[in-house]
């Protein structure tokens, strides 16, 4: 084997429950605090720290995300005097998102995702700067009020369509749906920051479950590692979501704005990357 081919092979490190639990803890804290599930953190940490290949890291991440997102979503919904999540909105987002992710995954072999990644990165920068500006000014509706606007059938149809588009983008590019759901609800529909994050956590569950099953059937899941990641991620997600309920809305919006800018830098294509089937769900 030549030196060049040797360098292209990813060799997994010796399994370490402590390392996987730490990875899960970091992802769970970020996912609970920001309402995005945690895949945005779990996947790169597995690749860099545990030396798992990209596909296996994504499949393992999706499996670990399920209990992490469930606990975080339950905290948003039950951990406050009023539920910080909207179930009808989550349902229509998930309905569109599941079909969109499947369509995106099917089309991913025939469509180049480079231009789409550039477009998504630009949108994330715009949304991140808007969140930061709103946090500094402090008068934006989603940071002042906590209520969900009164939605009618047309609004729910638009929300489902938004979920469909997000699902397609997720399936084509691998960007987690939660990263896009929160800005859609906050900036597109005027939903409060906290409620948008709690709703996002509920909405990504069906897509994460389908993605986890798909990767498991393909042999891209390390169940032992996923279990340890969930063990570290669940209590951290509980802490992160509790912090989200405690922080002022302006601070939470500012944090999410910074997160979107960081996500945009990761989204910008710098080289040919392997695409996951159903995204990483945040």
Report the location of each language-model feature.
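N-terminal signal-anchor/start-transfer transmembrane helix
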Residues: 26-30, 40-41, 45, 210
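Proline-centered helix-kink/hinge sites
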Residues: 43-44, 67, 182-183, 206, ...
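Membrane-embedded alpha-helical segments of transport systems
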Residues: 63-72, 107, 202-209, 235-236
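Transmembrane helix boundary and interhelical junction motifs in multipass membrane proteins
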Residues: 35-45, 172-184
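Hydrophobic alpha-helical transmembrane segments of integral membrane proteins
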Residues: 40-41, 63-64, 179-180, 202-203, ...
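Juxtamembrane transmembrane-helix boundary motif
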Residues: 1-29, 48-49, 54-56, 74-168, ...
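Small-residue hotspots at the loop-to-helix junctions and early N-terminal turns
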Residues: 58-62, 193-201
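Membrane-helix boundary/interface segments in integral membrane proteins
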Residues: 211-215
